[in-house]
């Protein structure tokens, strides 16, 4: 593996040396590829345009990131920014010099790449949804073919930029981002075939949230009992990150787990709340849908500004869970219900 890692470091050095002027683009690509964008931007937009696609986005994102966590615990992937300092591969000679950035010092294992995996799953859902809409609208065959090729090429381009950005930032090795793309696409393909996710009961949301959380915690405890330290990466991040403030607890494995579980549970609460059942029976006009999107995104932006101290880990994790749940309640229930009260709309019903 050292040889493979050394090739990855050489590529990172090459990218940082030759393409430093694109640092802003790479930083943007990594930021947008984070699942935070899915929960706080893409979901509220898709939910008020095409509900089934929005639900699929959340399920793919949550299941994919949960699997990413488990795989990282199993694969023990290194990260370039600390590996280059600790490896004996370079012997007595000088190790390559890698630049670090504010988003470099993630605290979890590196394989597979969560950004590449999440972006692959989310884009797969959106591309297949757009192609499905084109088929429903009976798009002309030639136009559909151009659309088909164009959308998949766009997804490929986005994934390429995301992968390059993760290597450029010295956060991942090339093989880790490739593994992320493959795994994320497979998760999206499998989850997309499941029809029950569109009609899951609140009980099922609760049980799945409980199962995924319990499995991850149980797996952690089991490996801990076998004397496997799953938090080994935290020490490396704190040791080798050049700026202590760049090491964030919200990139730790359990922080990610609780955020995702909060999102899934919040989605279940939102879809089965009395407020949602009231608005679901109403015919939403285009202006009202746009209003829901704009207000939801605005409120989520305000919610995103709510941060809390990581000094007490249990409190931090609990608040992360609650914040993520509220982030899904806002676009699914609270905003549509409030707008329907302010601007009464027609209720669906059968013609007699």
UniProtKB/Swiss-Prot annotation:
Family assignment from sequence similarity: Belongs to the glucose-6-phosphatase family.
Subcellular location field: Endoplasmic reticulum membrane
SMART domains associated with the record: acidPPc
Keyword Endoplasmic reticulum in record: yes
EC number annotated for this UniProt entry: 3.1.3.9
Gene designation per UniProt: g6pc1
GO biological process, one term: gluconeogenesis
Domain of life: Eukaryota
Residue numbers on the Lumenal membrane side: 1-27, 78-113, 163-166, 227-256, 311-324
Example of a GO cellular component annotation carried by this entry: endoplasmic reticulum membrane
Organism name: Haplochromis nubilus (Blue Victoria mouthbrooder)
Protein name according to UniProt: Glucose-6-phosphatase catalytic subunit 1
Motif Prevents secretion from ER per UniProt: ranges: 349-352
SUPFAM superfamilies reported for this sequence: Acid phosphatase/Vanadium-dependent haloperoxidase
Signal peptide: none
Any one Pfam family match given in the protein's UniProt record, by short name: PAP2
Annotated substrate binding sites: 79, 166
Ranges annotated as spanning the membrane: 28-48, 57-77, 114-134, 142-162, 167-187, 206-226, 257-276, 290-310, 325-345
Keywords: Endoplasmic reticulum, Gluconeogenesis, Hydrolase, Membrane, Transmembrane, Transmembrane helix
Catalysed reactions, as listed in the record: D-glucose 6-phosphate + H2O = D-glucose + phosphate
Cytoplasmic side: 49-56, 135-141, 188-205, 277-289, 346-352
Lineage of source species: Eukaryota, Metazoa, Chordata, Craniata, Vertebrata
Known function: Hydrolyzes glucose-6-phosphate to glucose in the endoplasmic reticulum. Forms with the glucose-6-phosphate transporter (SLC37A4/G6PT) the complex responsible for glucose production in the terminal step of glycogenolysis and gluconeogenesis. Hence, it is the key enzyme in homeostatic regulation of blood glucose levels.
């Amino acid at each position: 593996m050292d040889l493979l890692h050394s090739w990855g470091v050489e590529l990172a050095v090459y990218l940082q040396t030759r393409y430093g002027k694109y640092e802003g683009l790479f930083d943007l690509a990594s930021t947008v590829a984070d699942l935070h964008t899915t929960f706080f931007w893409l979901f509220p937009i898709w939910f008020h345009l095409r509900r089934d696609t929005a639900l699929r986005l959340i399920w793919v994102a949550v299941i994919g990131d949960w699997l990413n966590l488990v795989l990282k615990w199993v694969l023990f992937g290194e990260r370039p920014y600390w590996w280059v300092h600790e490896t004996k591969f370079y012997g007595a000679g000088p190790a390559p010099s890698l630049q670090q950035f504010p988003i470099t010092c993630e605290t979890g294992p590196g394989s597979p790449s969560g950004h590449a995996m999440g972006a692959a799953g989310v884009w797969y859902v959106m591309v297949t949804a757009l192609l499905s809409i084109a088929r429903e609208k009976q798009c002309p065959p030639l136009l559909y073919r151009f659309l088909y090729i164009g959308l998949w090429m766009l997804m490929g381009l986005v994934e390429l930029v995301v992968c390059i950005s993760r290597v450029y930032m010295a956060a991942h090795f090339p093989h880790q981002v490739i593994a992320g793309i493959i795994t994320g696409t497979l998760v999206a393909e499998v989850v997309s075939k499941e029809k029950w996710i569109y009609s899951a009961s609140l009980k099922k949301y609760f049980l799945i949230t409980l199962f995924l959380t319990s499995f991850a915690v149980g797996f952690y405890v089991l490996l801990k009992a076998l004397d496997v330290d799953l938090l080994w990466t935290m020490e490396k991040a704190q040791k080798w990150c050049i700026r202590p403030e760049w090491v964030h607890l919200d990139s730790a494995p359990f922080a990610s787990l609780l955020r995702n579980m909060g999102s899934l549970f919040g989605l279940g609460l939102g879809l089965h709340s009395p407020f949602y059942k009231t608005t679901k029976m109403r015919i939403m006009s285009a202006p009202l849908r746009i209003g829901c999107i704009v207000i939801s995104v605005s409120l989520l932006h305000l919610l995103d500004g709510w941060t809390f101290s990581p000094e007490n880990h249990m409190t931090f994790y609990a608040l992360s869970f609650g914040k993520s749940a509220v982030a899904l309640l806002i676009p699914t229930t609270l905003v549509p219900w409030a707008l329907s009260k302010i601007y009464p709309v027609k209720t669906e019903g059968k013609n007699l």
